[in-house]
Structure formats: structure tokens, C-alpha cells
């Protein structure tokens, strides 16, 4: 296809901020599998985007044998001067359609301390969170817990609310409240309306700080919806936030793509936040 982004590999893919800041992102890479990662145009851009983060959540991973993930990791490690590793959930879903949560992380910055699959006793989630505790020695908290969610669109209100139960479960299990909830919550437009927010505990409780505003547009297409979100809890982690760093990463502009080219990669933009390190 001869896309025009080739010269833009430079700074973003090198992850140069990693020594002075911790950048975390969440990216719903629509229907990520062998076809997408092996497409030289799509695979290269996805790898470059992910190599810009110290820790990144990838959603809509449909790759039970990890063949696409293995190729993705090769591509990330080829474009970055740093070595990346990954940890993933099992395929999740109530019916034949299943997705995996995938975290990729820069090995010299972060390491996996522990993981667990939220047991979901009330069957609140279509794809229950795969909870990961990372060690990040350069961060003030030293450890932080990442809780991913790709919410089923028409159950988004109930699923976002149920993240409060995951919050309590993590506190009970690991005795920490330094958590980052992130992913495609489908938290806007026809799935979550203004009158729904008061009933969502993750939103109504002052324990949580929502970093991506309702006014954001995290979609690549013509819609204007803040589907993808990042929510932080824990006094230590909140104090470590780099002010005004939470944002939507518009890779269409970054790589100078037209909308058709961008939509071939995903119908979502990544969302991201940066934490101060020492």
C-alpha cells in the first residue's frame, strides 16, 4: 500500500521517556489476530504504537495459540531498543466468541509480580478482568495493579459498576488500593448515558479519579464517543500522576494516515497516562 508513515518510526517507538516517566496505555486493536499482525502495514504501526509505552493493555485479542502475539512481540522488539515481554489471560467470553486480555511491558522498567482471573461470582462480566500486579521500582508506589475491562456494549453500565467489586476484591487479596482500571468500557453515547452515571459506583465514589473525560473522542471513525477510559485509585498512585498527561493517542495523525488506513488498524485510538518516576 505504500503508506506515508515510514519516516516516523523515530522517537515514539524508542520509548525514550521510560527512564524519567512511566507511560501506560490501553488499546482496543479491533479483532487482533494472525491476519492483522501479519499485514505489513497494520502490524508495523501497531508494534510502533505499543513500543511507545512502558506497559500497554491490548484488547480484542483473538489468538488462543498465541501465534499472533508471538509475531507482535517480535515486531515490538525489532522497532524498540528495549526488550518487551507479555502476559495474557485465557480466552474469555460467555459463548463461542472469546477474547483475551494482553499486557505488553518493557522488561527493564516493569515486571509481573502476580496475576489472577477475577472469579466473577455474580457473572457480571462478559470478559471478566484479568488482574495483574506489576513491580515498577522507579515509581513511587513500587507496585501497581492493572485491571482491564472490555465491556460488552449493551451491558456497559452494569459492567463498569461491577469494577467496584473487583476493587474490593483486589484490596482483600493483595492489600493495596493503588490500581489502574483501563480499557474499552463502551462508556459513552448510546451505551452509557448521562443519567446512568450516578448508579455507577466506580464513578460516584470519590475514591476514583477518571482521567479520560466524557468529552474525549476515542474512536477512529466519524462517531464522537469516549468509549475508552482510564481510572485511578490509591493515594500514592494518584500523587504519582503527571498532571494533564492523560490523553487520547491519535495514531492517525501520528502516522499521517487517512481514515481508511487508520480503520484498517482499529476503530479505537489508544488512551494513555504518564506517572512520575524518580
UniProtKB/Swiss-Prot annotation:
Key words of the record: Calcium, Cytoplasm, Disulfide bond, Endonuclease, Hydrolase, Magnesium, Metal-binding, Nuclease, Secreted, Signal
Keyword Kinase in annotation: no
Disulfide bonds: 189-225
Any one Pfam family match given in the protein's UniProt record, by short name: Exo_endo_phos
Major subcellular location class: cytoplasm
Residues spanning the signal sequence: 1-21
E.C. numbers: 3.1.21.-
Transcription listed as a keyword: no
Stored SUPFAM superfamilies: DNase I-like
The organism's place on the tree of life at top rank: Eukaryota
Example of a GO MF term: DNA nuclease activity
Catalytic EC class: hydrolase
Alphabetical GO biological process terms: corneocyte development; DNA catabolic process; hair follicle development
Subcellular location: Cytoplasm; Secreted
Cofactor(s) the protein needs: Mg(2+); Ca(2+)
GO cellular component, one term: cytoplasm
Active site feature: 99, 150
Function as written in the Swiss-Prot or TrEMBL entry: Divalent cation-dependent acid DNA endonuclease involved in the breakdown of the nucleus during corneocyte formation of epidermal keratinocytes. May play an immune role by eliminating harmful DNA released into the extracellular environment by damaged epidermal cells.
Alphabetical list of PANTHER family matching this protein: DEOXYRIBONUCLEASE, DEOXYRIBONUCLEASE-1-LIKE 2
Family that this chain belongs to: Belongs to the DNase I family.
Name of this protein: Deoxyribonuclease-1-like 2
Organism this protein belongs to: Mus musculus
